[in-house]
């Protein structure tokens, strides 16, 4: 292939056109590899076109005006024809640089070619539909305000129009007027050259805000026009930049950054007042006020009420508490058995050195639930000696089914006496309680706090704290409505976080636990333990034995809650004034005790019915017992228990049910099974606790070493020499290399060396650094650490 080297350098290489690059560019390729390479003639033509466009833009009559705008046809001037031909030749270059340009010459095809007749006919086809381009009227906005017209004239006379016209996208062009732009502020800044916009904004912040009166449009326009008369070229450009910058770079302020007690007008800037109200606001579910906090309220919980500095940013504000829960579920989980590294009998792995993931997450959830607080609640600050009330009731219906005519709500609260968490149940109305007589047996209920299957009762009282004034959502601000509930009855119990009732666990929960016979025997044993202890104190549960009042704390452990409420609510003045003898009291207690036994049988029967299909869960007790005997695998012993506990003759005199005989005959053998489970659970918990036994000791040792090393530059020369040994030991402690030469996390090395250091044994160890190595015992290292730590404290 013959190539002319002189002309090849002006020819674009085909590899650039096809592939975008040429791999022979630096290896002897004779063609050009520059896409923007143009000939001198093309450069001259391009420069001439740019000069003509610049003259047209400045409003002058250039020689190069297209011929189609002067003379239509072949009689155009020679200058116009030359310009038109040059524009057609360089149409591709100009199109690549200016894709959309309103100032480009109008394209007019030549009529002296072979297809000129067709083009002429096509042009004449639409000649009657629209006027000529040169006769088209200039577009002017209909609703253009006098302010924008005045600004256009100012910009045209000041020479800023040519500067702004060279920019493609500029908010300061004459045809653009930002919404809500206040030119009166620009006039004030222009009259005071030494002042700036932030200073004026600060003055406006100090002035008390008055209700804004609607201003007349004409008066407002006159004020703005008077302000524009004092603007010159330099002040106009400076003021536009000063006033437009806060609109663009205004920092976002959360909705709850201003406490309710602070004045709302102190943080509102002037430009924010002028903004339209249809501004985009963040979603309500992303604002911090709608998120439940995971930390207790403290002095640092609330955001600062100080004005935000003009320098931008909120760095100087005090850090607030974390608004999101702990990410305890992000721990590395244990691998499945098929992926676990096989270990020998005498070997162990890091998973066995710490708590299991399930137990750790369960404890984290309980701690998180204990520390949860809720903001902006219309609840009293203090109820008797308790504060920080948080509703924890999962039911949206406050009306009680156990105590008809009453509404009940459950709260979590803190005690002023010991600082512990308690569960406070509010019951209202309680207008029938007029003195302390209904609370005469509360001391007996408090004495049952040692029973493992009863939620301990701590306090009972009536209060007017919930009947204080509260704001009505339909009333205007400041109007208050007096609560009509009157006094409220409150019972305080021990608090168990993240608990569930048996109704939620087995019947109406999201993930119900299936019922088994072993589980039923366990529930029966624990309920009998609680009922027997209550009856031994000459007390009765009455209507408290219900699936919604039996809570599940851990695994299969249950507790009776709500004890003592039915007794207080069922008390009446007639009972207190009635003179009844001991025989009547014994007969009444026997009747109440029989009611408790029947309620216990109903609870077990309701749980046993969950083993049957829906069509076999009859309402009659006798039919349900037959279906359980025919359609389930329950043992005959448990069916006999259900038969005894649901016998209608229990509610008939002489109320001959004997609890001790029932325990010996039916439940004694299952007490051993329950005790075996409890002992195994106790041993497992103790084993898991032993894995965390040494964590505190080793953590204190590592903390002591880090404190000593952090103060290394402040010691003298002798101390630095001793400190150098400690630093080398720390580096060797966490510097483990695997067989492939890469660093590994050797947990065994860290634990073994820290335990040896804590004991101070005489074993020698080799410490290696970049420049030296030393042999020293753990006892000497421990003495150095203790000495340096005493110097640090002294």
Curated annotation (Swiss-Prot):
GO molecular function, one term: poly(A) binding
UniProt zinc finger (C3H1-type) residues: 7-36
Keywords: ATP-binding, Coiled coil, Cytoplasm, Metal-binding, mRNA processing, Nucleotide-binding, Zinc, Zinc-finger
Region listing for Disordered, in residue ranges: 40-97, 187-226
InterPro entries per the UniProt record, alphabetical: Kinase-like_dom_sf, PAN3, Pan3_PK, Prot_kinase_dom, Znf_CCCH
Composition bias, Polar residues: 83-94, 189-199
GO cellular component entries: P-body; PAN complex
Subunit structure: Homodimer. Forms a heterotrimer with a catalytic subunit PAN2 to form the poly(A)-nuclease (PAN) deadenylation complex. Interacts (via PAM-2 motif) with poly(A)-binding protein PAB1 (via PABC domain), conferring substrate specificity of the enzyme complex.
Domain observations: The N-terminal zinc finger binds to poly(A) RNA.
Protein name per Swiss-Prot or TrEMBL: PAN2-PAN3 deadenylation complex subunit PAN3
Gene name of the encoded protein: PAN3
